[in-house]
């Protein structure tokens, strides 16, 4: 049969804080995407416009005692995707998000526990995205994600994402 595609849902009536919603989402992610659990990803901030996820160095280390490039790529990709998932849950209900293009730049090695911050498009652009999803059922959204170390961007991601509403079951 077809592979199971997780549909992440949010109970909008729980009164949870945004950070608590992000943490609950990460628990779902750990269950449905084993790599996220292995990497020990954790939500540390979500304000409705930017999301920060962190990861410890130890399970993500390479042979040079720095963060493995694949782990860094995974973290920036998941952080951007999760930011759009959380935003769409809050504003649109159940949606799918898929990355359709990305560019990652590795500027400096990361030598300790690390975090990535995704910032959604500016309010006017993300509002236009919501309008398009409501009217056409889908839209594209671009965002930036960065991992900083020692006050400088060590890794950056620019990604295009498709966002579409989940058909009612």
How should these model regions be labeled?
Residues 37-41, 100-105, 128-130:
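Short structured motifs
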Residues 8-28:
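Polybasic, low-complexity association/targeting segments
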Residues 38-67:
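Catalytic strand-loop segment that frames the active site of acyl-thioester-processing enzymes
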Residues 84-122:
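Hydrophobic beta-strand-centered segment that forms part of the acyl-chain substrate-binding groove
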């Amino acid at each position: 049969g077809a592979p199971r595609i997780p549909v992440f849902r949010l109970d909008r009536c729980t009164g949870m804080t945004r950070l608590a919603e992000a943490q609950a989402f990460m628990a779902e992610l750990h269950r449905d995407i084993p790599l996220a659990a292995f990497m020990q990803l954790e939500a540390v901030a979500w304000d409705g416009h930017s999301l920060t996820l962190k990861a410890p160095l130890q399970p993500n280390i390479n042979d040079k005692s720095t963060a493995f490039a694949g782990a860094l790529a995974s973290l920036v990709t998941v952080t951007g995707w999760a930011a759009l998932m959380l935003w769409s849950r809050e504003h649109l209900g159940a949606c799918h998000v898929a990355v359709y293009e990305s560019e990652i730049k590795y500027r400096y090695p990361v030598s300790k526990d690390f975090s990535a911050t995704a910032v959604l498009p500016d309010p006017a652009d993300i509002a236009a995205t919501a309008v398009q999803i409501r009217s056409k059922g889908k839209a594209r959204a671009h965002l930036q994600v960065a991992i900083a170390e020692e006050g400088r961007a060590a890794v950056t991601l620019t990604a295009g994402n498709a966002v579409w509403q989940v058909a009612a079951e």
